[in-house]
């Protein structure tokens, strides 16, 4: 692993000092002066690789904090508590957060939903941005305690860690927008009016001046037995880019194609012309059961997905 902010390895010509007794001091001073001149001109290849800054352990700790709030269905006190926590973490990492609140009809009556939209402090609005998204709600169950460690928790914890890392690289952060969707889960069955409440609302109310070059939706990315399956409806160029990023990091065996399309928060975004890929591991035995608990989540899995995403962002999607 390369050292953060390592210096360019540019040869430095040695000069013999006139006074021998001052030789060491003069050498140190000369080297320090040359380094100060060379540092700003270091090539990007010589800088620390952003994906090496990500910590799966820190992402897992974020998942734990979310799970500690208990079940977090839309409209509940617990989701409001988790919402405040997410906002606080984002602001600590240098992001400005806006609440997009709305009320929608559901099979259980009217429910208030709140999307969280984060842009980096001082971010301009002229260039097209890249979306990084996760839903942070958990499915409503009456008969079981569903804390959604993987389904809702893992992707949100990872996105908070991505926010921390990207926030340390302002030039990259200026090209990214983070969205935490409320209401991804359907109350009965996914349909045009049930499920994906937050992403449908976000897509419908995008202003004409808002331009996005693409997006990634993270969902269920913490399974200890990781097998990320990109849905069949994934934008082909983005899928190739994700696979290439995984290959470059020698993590390709964790990524494959799903043999069918997937209904998820990427669907409304693709429908309005924002190419968005769903990074999801749907092969999860505890999906929508009381067994979706923190012990099923792995820091290594979060590390893998986050590293590939950062490589894809910095070396493929936002290279220029």
Q: What kind of feature is each model-predicted range?
A:
Residues 103-105, 214, 223-320:
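Active-site-adjacent substrate-binding region
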Residues 5-11, 24-25, 29:
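Short, low-complexity intrinsically disordered segments enriched in A/P/G/S/L with frequent Arg
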Residues 143-245, 249-253, 258-261, 266:
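Acidic/histidine-rich catalytic neighborhood of metal-dependent amide-processing enzymes
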Residues 72-74, 103-107, 124-125, 136-140, ...:
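Solvent-exposed loop/turn segments at secondary-structure junctions
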Residues 44-82, 93, 223, 285-293:
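N-terminal capping segment at the start of a domain
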Residues 65-125:
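A non-catalytic alpha/beta surface segment that caps or lines the substrate-entry region
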Residues 58-65, 81, 85-92, 97, ...:
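Extracytoplasmic/secreted proteins, especially bacterial periplasmic and envelope-associated proteins
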Residues 29-39:
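Bacterial N-terminal signal peptides
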């Amino acid at each position: 692993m390369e050292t953060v902010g390592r210096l360019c390895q540019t040869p430095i010509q040695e000069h013999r000092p006139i006074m021998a007794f001052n030789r060491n001091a003069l050498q140190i001073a000369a080297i320090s002066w040359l380094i100060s001149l060379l540092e700003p001109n270091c090539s990007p290849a010589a800088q620390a690789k952003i994906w090496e800054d990500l910590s799966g352990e820190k992402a897992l700790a974020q998942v734990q904090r979310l799970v500690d709030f208990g079940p977090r269905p839309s409209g509940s006190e617990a989701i409001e508590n988790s919402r405040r926590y997410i906002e606080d973490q984002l602001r600590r990492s240098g992001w400005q957060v806006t609440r997009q609140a709305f009320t929608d009809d559901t099979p259980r009556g009217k429910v208030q939903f709140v999307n969280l939209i984060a842009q980096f402090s001082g971010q301009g609005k002229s260039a097209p941005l890249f979306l990084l998204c996760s839903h942070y709600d958990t499915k409503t169950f009456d008969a079981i305690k569903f804390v959604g460690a993987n389904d809702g928790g893992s992707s949100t914890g990872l996105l908070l860690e991505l926010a921390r890392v990207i926030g340390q690289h302002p030039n990259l952060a200026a090209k990214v927008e983070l969205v935490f969707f409320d209401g991804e889960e359907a109350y009965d069955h996914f349909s045009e009016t049930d499920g994906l409440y937050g992403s449908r609302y976000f897509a419908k109310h995008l202003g004409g001046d808002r331009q996005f070059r693409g997006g990634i939706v993270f969902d269920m990315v913490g399974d200890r037995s990781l097998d990320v399956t990109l849905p069949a409806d994934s934008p082909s160029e983005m899928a190739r880019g994700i696979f290439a990023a995984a290959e470059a990091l020698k993590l390709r065996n964790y990524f494959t194609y799903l043999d069918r399309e997937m209904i998820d928060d990427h669907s409304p975004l693709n429908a309005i012309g924002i190419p968005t890929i769903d990074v999801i591991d749907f092969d999860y035995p505890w999906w929508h059961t009381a067994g979706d608990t923190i012990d099923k989540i792995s820091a290594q899995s979060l590390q893998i997905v986050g590293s590939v995403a950062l490589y894809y962002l910095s070396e493929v999607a936002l290279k220029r």
